[in-house]
C-alpha cells in the first residue's frame, strides 16, 4: 500500500482494480477543511486519462507491473507476433496494444512487454532505433530556405523530417518517444 502523500510522477497504483500511472499530482491544503491530493491518472489498461481527488494520506495498493524481454518476429496483418526469449512462447498483440510503437518495429528487435496480472498492457520500446531510409528527395546544395529538412520514408513505412544531407540507403537513429531524427548511424 502506498499513501497519496508519497505520489510521484510515473508511479503506478491500482485504482478501482485497474493499474494507473500518475501523470501529474498536486497537494492542496485549503484554508478550511482537510488537505487532499488532486492527481491526473492514466489507466494503463484502457489508455484513458482521468483526474481524481484523494484525501491526504489515503492508502492505495501499488500496481505490480512485470516486464518481459521479447523478440519481435513478424506481422500477419491483424497481429504482431513476439517471442519470449526464455520459454520460446509466442504472443500475438494487436496494433492497439502496441500503440505508437508499431511504427518503429523491425524484425528481430528486442522490446519489453509490460504485464499486469498476466494481461498485456503495452510495450516499452528502446528510446532510439536505427532504421534505413528507403525513399527521400535529393538534397539540393544551398537550398536551406525551407528550414533545412525534407521528408523521408523509412523501412517500417514511417515518414519523418530529416536534414538535407540524408540520402536513400542511409541508416539513421530515430527517437521512438518523439518520432524525431537524431543522427546518422
From Swiss-Prot:
The gene is efp. GO terms for biological process: peptide biosynthetic process. Keywords: Cytoplasm, Elongation factor, Protein biosynthesis. GO terms for cellular component: cytoplasm. It comes from the Bacteria. NCBIfam families: efp, PRK00529.1. This is Elongation factor P. The keyword Metal-binding does not apply. PANTHER family: ELONGATION FACTOR P (PTHR30053), ELONGATION FACTOR P (EF-P) FAMILY PROTEIN (PTHR30053:SF12). CDD domains: S1_EF-P_repeat_1, S1_EF-P_repeat_2. The keyword Protein biosynthesis applies. One of its GO terms (molecular function) is translation elongation factor activity. Involved in peptide bond synthesis. Stimulates efficient translation and peptide-bond synthesis on native or reconstituted 70S ribosomes in vitro. Probably functions indirectly by altering the affinity of the ribosome for aminoacyl-tRNA, thus increasing their reactivity as acceptors for peptidyl transferase. Belongs to the elongation factor P family. It holds the Pfam family EFP. Signal peptide: none annotated. It comes from Desulforudis audaxviator (strain MP104C). Pathway: Protein biosynthesis; polypeptide chain elongation. It is found in: Cytoplasm.
Amino acid at each position: 500500500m502506498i499513501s497519496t502523500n508519497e505520489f510521484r510522477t510515473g508511479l503506478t497504483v491500482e485504482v478501482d482494480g485497474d493499474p494507473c500511472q500518475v501523470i501529474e499530482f498536486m497537494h492542496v491544503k485549503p484554508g478550511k477543511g482537510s488537505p487532499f491530493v488532486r492527481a491526473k491518472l492514466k489507466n494503463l489498461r484502457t489508455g484513458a486519462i482521468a483526474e481524481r481527488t484523494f484525501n491526504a494520506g489515503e492508502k492505495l495498493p501499488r500496481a505490480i507491473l512485470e516486464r518481459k524481454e521479447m523478440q519481435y518476429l513478424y506481422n500477419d496483418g491483424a497481429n504482431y507476433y513476439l517471442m519470449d526469449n526464455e520459454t520460446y512462447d509466442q504472443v500475438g498483440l494487436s496494433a492497439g496494444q502496441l500503440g505508437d510503437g508499431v511504427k518503429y518495429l523491425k524484425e528481430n528487435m528486442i522490446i519489453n512487454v509490460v504485464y499486469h496480472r498476466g494481461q498485456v498492457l503495452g510495450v516499452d520500446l528502446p528510446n532510439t532505433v536505427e532504421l534505413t531510409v528507403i525513399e527521400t528527395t535529393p538534397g539540393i546544395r544551398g537550398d536551406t530556405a525551407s528550414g533545412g529538412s525534407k521528408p523521408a520514408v523509412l523501412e517500417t513505412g514511417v515518414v519523418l523530417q530529416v536534414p538535407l544531407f540524408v540520402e536513400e540507403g542511409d541508416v539513421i537513429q530515430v527517437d521512438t518517444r518523439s518520432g524525431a531524427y537524431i543522427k546518422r548511424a
